[in-house]
From Swiss-Prot:
Residues 180-396 are annotated as: Domain III, AAA+ region. Residues 1-72 are annotated as: Domain I, interacts with DnaA modulators. PANTHER family: CHROMOSOMAL REPLICATION INITIATOR PROTEIN DNAA. InterPro entries: AAA+_ATPase, Chromosome_initiator_DnaA, Chromosome_initiator_DnaA-like, DnaA_C, DnaA_dom, DnaA_N_dom, DnaA_N_sf, P-loop_NTPase. Residues 72-179 are annotated as: Domain II. Oligomerizes as a right-handed, spiral filament on DNA at oriC. This is Chromosomal replication initiator protein DnaA. It comes from Marinomonas sp. (strain MWYL1). One of its GO terms (biological process) is regulation of DNA replication.
Amino acid sequence: MSLEHWNLCLQRLQSEFSTSQFNTWIRPLQAEMLPNGELCLSAPNRFVLDWVSNKYQTRIKELLSEFAGDDLAPALKLAVKAQNFAQANQMSPPPPPVSSEPAINPLNNEVARESGYRPGFGLMDDEEGSPNADLEFEAPLTLSGTGLRGELEPYEQGQLPLTAPKRKVQVEGGINHGANLNNSFTFDNFIEGKSNQLAHAAALQVAENPGGAYNPLFIYGGVGLGKTHLMQAVGTEMMRHNPNAKVVYLHSERFVADMVKALQLNAINDFKRYYRSVDALLIDDIQFFAGKDRTQEEFFHTFNALLEGGQQMILTCDRYPKEIQGLEDRLKSRFGWGLTVAIEPPELETRVAILMRKADESGIKLSYDSAFFIAQKIRSNVRELEGALKRVIANSHFTGRAITPDFVRESLKDLLALQDKLVNIDNIQRIVAEYYKIKISDLLSKRRSRSVARPRQVAMSLAKELTNHSLPEIGDAFGGRDHTTALHAIRKIKELQDTDSDIREDYKQLMRILTT
């Protein structure tokens, strides 16, 4: 057996697993041949090791036997990869001493320019929705024997209040100003489903054992799927267990703004001490660091310091770390040292459960049929789902009418009309044809080759799920086919989604494109 057999095994596993499964469990494995002829697969942590051992080891051995020869029993060993921080730090320059940072003129500083600094305009443009609009800083920080503490005397020239800044706007549910956490984001009100099951389990483990094997925890997925909720739930749980824990949550833009402010005031040493003294650092939307070289340099050393100190980090992003353009490879590599998990758009059952929970929290009686109707129509993300529910509740409150499926349809009629306008059979055919790199005329033709028939079946299934057209109408729209052909296509795609990872991923991607 050789590493070539493992490479063949990787190719097969990538075709069998969904993208998120492969990226989470298989891609992080590092293979090497041991002197005794064993193939050793090293996992980045115990969590991945246990999962691969329990779920995938049998399949891996089957494939190795297939590629190495049926008569050769695969000699396979699974282990946890040892993290040698000394070696890791040799890969790149070590962090400079805290006292060696020179003063930098922000007008000539690349980071200041990247962050939007302009003379006379403050750190960043305070546009509506900007994470830096209406910022307040708490009392300036000084060093004490137990870390940073707030002082009440006025700021001195050149002194920077390096706590995470907070908004003047109060978030519903209350904010813990010490950690900048929204206390309404908890594990108790997070709805678990197939789409977020792994991320939820990993977050619970981190909350119970911060700084352990799953450090950093990297959560990625689209907008409005619950990444921030889950990350803040960990922070809230950590502070519930230890009220004195120094947990800091912030958006990545805030980290950049704090650093630029520190450079302006010649207080970069205080900045370093603060961010390296926390017990847990939670940073949202890490993709904002892309293209900001000075920020990445500083965060790289902060990352190393926290990891070596056993301090927990949780990062969120809108994409897999390897796919972040403009981010240094050394950071991408380190993001994978812990556990990387995906959150997918919620499936129908989870969407219904979310609506029922939100209605209950609002003291509103929502029937299953009404929740099902909303969940069937709003598929893109949790944020839009909640927005639709709030609209229905408000309409019910103002009119005094009970919430029924008909009332829901009436309340959301303009939203549904817009959705129907955007998602119609013509658009579905166009998007599917572009996705599979075929012509729309191929979908309407009598051709039955798999390269055309399968995309046609996918398009028919999407048309049934995303539009209100009947089976005869769908069949007719695809080259004058009858309703039995459309029904067969829908059933076939549903069956393939359970057995074919490629079809399952294609369908998810197309659904995301059509509903976002």
